[in-house]
Amino acid sequence: MPVEAPRPARHLEVERKFDVIESTVSPSFEGIAAVVRVEQSPTQQLDAVYFDTPSHDLARNQITLRRRTGGADAGWHLKLPAGPDKRTEMRAPLSASGDAVPAELLDVVLAIVRDQPVQPVARISTHRESQILYGAGGDALAEFCNDDVTAWSAGAFHAAGAADNGPAEQQWREWELELVTTDGTADTKLLDRLANRLLDAGAAPAGHGSKLARVLGATSPGELPNGPQPPADPVHRAVSEQVEQLLLWDRAVRADAYDAVHQMRVTTRKIRSLLTDSQESFGLKESAWVIDELRELANVLGVARDAEVLGDRYQRELDALAPELVRGRVRERLVDGARRRYQTGLRRSLIALRSQRYFRLLDALDALVSERAHATSGEESAPVTIDAAYRRVRKAAKAAKTAGDQAGDHHRDEALHLIRKRAKRLRYTAAATGADNVSQEAKVIQTLLGDHQDSVVSREHLIQQAIAANTAGEDTFTYGLLYQQEADLAERCREQLEAALRKLDKAVRKARD
């Protein structure tokens, strides 16, 4: 997989599907104020081959990947969930490679398929009659499709060990109602009005989220027979939810979405914190490989994250200064330089996200969340509580107070950073175990000291850039101005810490009552 995989264009699809019987008459859209004209489109014959892993990992994540011929949009289509009635569609053209999935589409879902084979799992043939609904301005508003569907499931769908008796043919009729979106927005009220006409005509909301889901036997979007159930244990459930978020942010990072690297790193650290504070429950040891791998992944993502945060920070601070206070090449060095470092960090991150090492980490996380809470000596593990995590926060706070009284700035900053890391672990554990007030107060401390740590990193970077600017004979006035602003911010954060710690203590004592 190339480091710089091309990014396919994205299109927001807003549609609803309806089940109808053979005798149901197509609806009329007369009387709907927004619709001034309905135009019949030529009949289409669409043939699509759907691809997935042998265990249907894409379908379980409500994702479809197909190669379609016929119609105006022949090509490869990848559809991702984007909310109720919405999916993000990405396309690639047909090529001479036949059934080889385009690399740019496969890369989008690489965290789901990993190094498994992606192969045909179904073929769907659709005879489509469609109508385009136009508004007063002459623009298309929506498309109504009357589909007669014939489908065949591939032998890969059969359960492990089951005999393969060949593909089974299925036939049904369905309606689709798709809005024409503009700049990623859609008139959902219009969709409701149009959908009511279909219901009045005798249609029923589809019992499947896609044609493929019906072929594979799903009863609702993303649900396949014998799919995993959410863990009952709250900490296991929290880890499971964060692993799902990790896969979502993985796709956002590959698309270079704003703040995606930062959020993926946050999610990685959440998982690591929850596992570290619940090792007995998960059957892990202190030096567990999965915890070490999560730390390493966060470190790799941190290069791009730090550059993105610093670049945004300097952009805001420089924009807030009077023009006469911004001297020399400070914007080029601080903002443009951060953007270059971000691109370097992003390339490193993408290399990591396409590696076997990353795939094995994801496999290990899947195994952890799918297993029952680890039991010791035939008994259930002790429930995870906030007590141990809070004791670590108090210990770090005491050490920081000592460092503030006796040590220099560096040791003080390190001690405050330790409070932040431990408050973060407490926050995640408290949220997972239902101690919401504790989680909120821990978040306040995490945010406060996060701002402090960003100030520490920023001041170190400002010194380095000021030295380079001075060596080049440039004006360094603005670097000193920004440095003092950062120092003032750090001082304000330290002044607010004691009160925040008291509020946390109060929340913990209340949670214990």
UniProtKB/Swiss-Prot annotation:
Gene3D superfamilies for this protein: CHAD domain (1.40.20.10), Hypothetical Protein Pfu-838710-001 (2.40.320.10)
Classification via InterPro entries: CHAD_dom (IPR007899), CHAD_dom_sf (IPR038186), CYTH-like_dom_sf (IPR033469), CYTH_domain (IPR023577)
Top-level taxonomic group: Bacteria
Domain CYTH: 11-219
Family annotation (PROSITE patterns): CHAD, CYTH
CHAD domain boundaries: 228-506
Pfam families listed in its UniProt record: CHAD, CYTH
Designated name of the protein: Uncharacterized protein MT2285
Species per Swiss-Prot/TrEMBL record: Mycobacterium tuberculosis (strain CDC 1551 / Oshkosh)
Source lineage: Bacteria, Bacillati, Actinomycetota, Actinomycetes, Mycobacteriales
